[in-house]
Amino acid sequence: MAKVLLGFMGVGKSSVAPYLNGRFVDMDQVIEDKIGMSITDFFAKEGEASFRQIESETLEELLQEGDDVIISTGGGVVVTECNRKLLKKNRKHNVWLHSSFDVVYNRIKKDIKNQRPLFLNHSKEEFKAIYDGRMALYKGLADLVVTVDNRTPEEVARFIKCM
């Protein structure tokens, strides 16, 4: 089974994955290639339900690719029951990259290049509620929890490799 990096948006999944041993696949990039536009544009045009359907199909495909693949998921991959069931089948390989809300919030706020609809369309308080709601979902799926605050992507990857 594949190694799957889970965690809230902005936690550094796509930054850590290339430092791990294996074939790196950025799930968001795979989805964008499939839909022919950015996820932000797709969300605006087709809505969240359509996006989550494509996300589930993509996750199922990627989980079948073999033991050598390192999948960097989108932060919302855990919100649908279908995806959680797929990830539970992958039980021994789910790594939750955890970061405090303030660190994640500030990273996303500074990332002008990568504007995220969930961030842009909610107040800080609403965004915190979304963050809090997802923490239990990540925890329920994680075989390994790595706190990434004050660690470089290389340090996080070294820690994961040691486990």
UniProtKB/Swiss-Prot annotation:
Q: Does Cytoplasm count among this protein's keywords?
A: yes
Keyword annotations for this protein?
Amino-acid biosynthesis, Aromatic amino acid biosynthesis, ATP-binding, Cytoplasm, Kinase, Magnesium, Metal-binding, Nucleotide-binding, Transferase
Q: How is the cofactor bound?
A: Binds 1 Mg(2+) ion per subunit.
Question: Is Kinase found in the keyword set?
Answer: yes
GO process annotations (BP): amino acid biosynthetic process; aromatic amino acid family biosynthetic process; chorismate biosynthetic process
Quote the record's binding site residues for substrate: 28, 52, 75, 134
Question: Where along this sequence does the record place binding of Mg(2+)?
Answer: 14
User: What would be one Pfam family of this protein?
Assistant: SKI
* Enzyme Commission numbers on file: 2.7.1.71
What are the required cofactors? Mg(2+)
Report the principal subcellular site: cytoplasm
**GO (cellular component) term, any one:** cytosol
Q: Which SUPFAM superfamilies does the record associate with it?
A: P-loop containing nucleoside triphosphate hydrolases
- Where in or outside the cell? Cytoplasm
Reactions accelerated catalytically: shikimate + ATP = 3-phosphoshikimate + ADP + H(+)
Instruction: Please provide, alphabetically and separated by semicolons, the GO molecular function terms listed in this UniProt record.
Output: ATP binding; magnesium ion binding; shikimate kinase activity
Q: In which pathway does it act?
A: Metabolic intermediate biosynthesis; chorismate biosynthesis; chorismate from D-erythrose 4-phosphate and phosphoenolpyruvate: step 5/7
Organism superkingdom:
Bacteria
Q: Which residues bind ATP?
A: 10-15, 116, 151
The record's note on quaternary structure and interaction partners says: Monomer.
Q: What PANTHER family does the record point to?
A: SHIKIMATE KINASE (PTHR21087), SHIKIMATE KINASE 1, CHLOROPLASTIC (PTHR21087:SF16)
Q: Which family does it belong to?
A: Belongs to the shikimate kinase family.
What's its job? Catalyzes the specific phosphorylation of the 3-hydroxyl group of shikimic acid using ATP as a cosubstrate.
Q: What is this protein called?
A: Shikimate kinase
User: Native species of this protein?
Assistant: Streptococcus thermophilus (strain ATCC BAA-491 / LMD-9)
